[in-house]
């Protein structure tokens, strides 16, 4: 069911022309910064993949992919991608990328089962990136280092945006705070995961929550994560599980936490088998991607996705992602947004 967060006294700081120019500037500047910071080179990515190979991202495991038959392949079915989490790792092997280097791509996806609101659209655009790492780098310390560098690129982009449009004032803190999902649960045991995110983000401004996908001490997950890309079951620091997480910020325009990126160190052979067993998905072991990984034909890697429209929305202080990208929205949402000063494209 679609929902609308109504910002109080909202007024767009940019007109339509400035907004389009700002989107272009942010996208070009940030991806250059990301590429330089993590030593990534751009590659061309697919909009769809063949169904049944285990390449598409299953997200939380319940979202349906958009599918269609391909006439010239005997009506074999293709799926529009949800993300390129597993495709990128296959590409690292195909390109023969060495440790310390990686790839990034402009990913466009359709998520037909998304619940529409100010942050969630049917159309998803991300910088999807993946880098080859060594066995010794599969640690929380390495993960934190990469997160810190990505956050630095975000803040540099915020500085450029505020210099270009002085009416936009910076709000991101200098440093990002790290916390494990279990530690967050202990801090706020009576709150829901979303309420915990709001509380910690309002306190620190920018937060990386570690260990998303596995069950916590209350028997529940902080949030879902497919079992076959992020490693959420390997022990990290202080006996806590998980080598992955989310970058979130406190977004004053909407008065709530705001996820910018989901990322992590990827599963190795052992953690893949363990996570498939935990999720009762062991039948996936026979799929193309999983066989490649189990046969040690794929490199160890770290990767993630950074929302393009989301980053632009935050840095341009917009109230709705539909002010940044063209998509389909319920008519009553469009009408209500217009009353609130948010003109959806």
Regions found by a protein language model. Give the residues of each.
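Class II aminoacyl-tRNA synthetase-like tRNA-binding/catalytic domains
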Residues: 2-120, 128-132
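Generic recognition of stable, solvent-exposed alpha-helical segments in well-folded globular domains
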Residues: 21, 25, 29, 138-145, ...
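Generic structural hydrophobic/aromatic packing signal, biased to beta-strands
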Residues: 23-26, 30, 34, 68, ...
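A generic secondary-structure signal for well-formed alpha-helical elements
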Residues: 34-41, 150-161, 319
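N-terminal pre-domains immediately preceding structured catalytic cores
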Residues: 43, 52-56, 168-179, 330
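A generic structural signal for short, non-catalytic loop/turn and secondary-structure boundary residues
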Residues: 61, 73, 96-99, 103, ...
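Extended, charged alpha-beta segments that form solvent-exposed binding/catalytic grooves
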Residues: 105-199
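A translation/RNA-centric and nucleic-acid-associated enzymatic feature enriched
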Residues: 110, 181-345
């Amino acid at each position: 069911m679609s929902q609308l967060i109504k910002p109080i006294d909202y007024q767009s700081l940019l007109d339509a022309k400035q907004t389009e120019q700002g989107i272009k500037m942010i996208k070009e500047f940030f991806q250059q910064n990301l590429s330089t910071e993590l030593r990534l080179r751009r590659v061309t990515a697919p909009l769809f993949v063949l169904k049944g190979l285990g390449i598409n991202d299953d997200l939380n495991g319940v979202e349906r992919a958009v599918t269609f038959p391909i006439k010239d392949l005997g009506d074999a079915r293709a799926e529009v991608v949800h993300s390129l989490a597993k495709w990128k790792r296959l590409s690292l092997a195909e390109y023969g990328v060495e440790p310390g280097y990686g790839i990034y791509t402009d990913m466009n996806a359709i998520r037909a089962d998304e619940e529409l609101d100010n942050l969630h659209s049917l159309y998803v655009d991300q910088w999807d990136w993946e880098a080859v790492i060594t066995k010794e780098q599969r640690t929380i310390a390495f993960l934190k280092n990469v997160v810190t560098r990505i956050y630095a690129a975000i803040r540099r982009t915020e500085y450029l945006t505020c210099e270009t449009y002085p009416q936009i004032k910076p709000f991101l803190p200098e440093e990002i705070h790290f916390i494990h999902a279990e530690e967050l649960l202990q801090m706020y045991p009576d709150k829901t995961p979303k309420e915990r995110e709001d509380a910690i983000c309002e306190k620190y401004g920018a937060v990386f929550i570690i260990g998303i996908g596995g069950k916590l001490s209350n028997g529940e997950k902080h949030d879902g994560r497919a079992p076959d890309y992020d490693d959420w079951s390997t022990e990290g620091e202080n006996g806590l599980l998980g080598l992955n997480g989310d970058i979130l910020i406190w977004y004053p325009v909407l008065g709530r936490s705001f996820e910018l990126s989901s990322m992590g160190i990827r599963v190795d052979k052992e953690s893949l088998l363990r996570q498939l067993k935990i999720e009762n998905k062991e039948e996936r072991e026979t799929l193309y991607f999983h066989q490649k990984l189990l046969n040690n034909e794929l490199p160890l890697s770290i990767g993630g996705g950074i929302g393009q429209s989301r980053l632009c929305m935050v840095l341009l202080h917009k109230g709705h992602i539909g002010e940044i990208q063209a998509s389909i929205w319920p008519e009553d949402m469009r009408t209500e947004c217009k009353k609130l000063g948010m003109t959806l494209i």
